[in-house]
């Protein structure tokens, strides 16, 4: 069964693409009775405020017609930023050699949080270098991941 995020991704990606942007990912967070639907968009050269506004208007119109969210919600559209979340294996592949932070659903070696250099991707496994040791993690066990911004 597909998640709400997966359903929204499928429903909205073409409309976002038609506006010249890539739908990088979607996060849905419930706080009390309200939900926040957060869309991350990206494009070559970076995302502008106007891009976010255009995507927000288009997505709002689609969601009003399709009505896939039963509860009240707020829609947010933004760039993924420097510490961008990673949602898919192809996105992870773009950041091989960089530091990422990962939060797991099920602990590995009694740890849910890992941070290290993304070494490689093989099938559905990612390999991080953590304290000079390889740590292999199953992609399906990753609850949340993001690039670690360096300044």
From Swiss-Prot:
Q: Name one GO biological process term.
A: translation
| Alphabetized CDD domains for the sequence | YlxS_C (cd01734)
Main localization is cytoplasm
- Give Gene Ontology CC terms: cytosol
- InterPro entries the UniProt entry points to: Ribosome_maturation_RimP, RimP_C, RimP_C_sf, RimP_N, RimP_N_sf
What is the name attached to this protein's record?
Answer: Ribosome maturation factor RimP
Q: Which family does it belong to?
A: Belongs to the RimP family.
Instruction: Please explain the role this protein plays, according to its UniProt record.
Output: Required for maturation of 30S ribosomal subunits.
**Where is this protein localized, as stated in its record?**
Cytoplasm
What does the UniProt keyword field contain? Cytoplasm, Ribosome biogenesis
């Amino acid at each position: 069964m597909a998640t709400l995020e997966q359903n929204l991704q499928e429903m909205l990606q073409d409309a976002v693409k038609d506006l010249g942007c890539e739908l990088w990912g979607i996060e849905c967070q419930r706080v009390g009775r309200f939900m926040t639907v957060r869309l991350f968009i990206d494009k070559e050269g970076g995302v502008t405020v106007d891009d976010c506004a255009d995507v927000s208007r288009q997505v709002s119109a689609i969601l009003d017609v399709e009505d896939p969210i039963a509860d009240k919600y707020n829609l947010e559209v933004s760039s993924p930023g420097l510490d961008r979340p990673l949602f898919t294996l192809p996105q992870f592949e773009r950041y091989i050699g960089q530091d990422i932070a990962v939060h797991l659903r099920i602990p590995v070696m009694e740890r849910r949080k890992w941070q290290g250099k993304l070494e490689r991707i093989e099938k559905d496994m990612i390999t991080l270098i953590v304290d000079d040791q390889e740590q292999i993690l199953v992609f399906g066990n990753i609850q949340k991941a993001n690039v670690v911004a360096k300044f």
